């Protein structure tokens, strides 16, 4: 299957959206970058549903919203990652998103399946950074 890559686009306020398709797993992870104030309306728009709002968004360096039946998880970052710490936060949130994907696949994380997780983190991080640099 061909990789589908979307350039960052502005959606729902001041957020930039990046779609990362996970290849043969036919699973999409969304990353949005921008102010926390626009996040609730984005999630409700993307998933066409209400969700349990989190009050800790304003202090967070990044978050991963999971558990949606109709779409993949959403990684949120307050700004484009540039420092090692910010890129590390993206990788951290990517791990949460990939655990969701592996649950969806029915695959337990263990030594003989950890390559899916490790490769996936690299794929998400490199895709998000590449798409943000295109701006």
Where are these regions (language model features)?
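Active-site scaffold of zinc-dependent metalloenzymes
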Residues: 36, 40-84, 97-101
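Short alpha-helical catalytic segment bearing the HExxH-like zincin motif
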Residues: 85-94
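Post-HExxH zinc-binding segment in Zn-dependent metallohydrolases
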Residues: 108-135
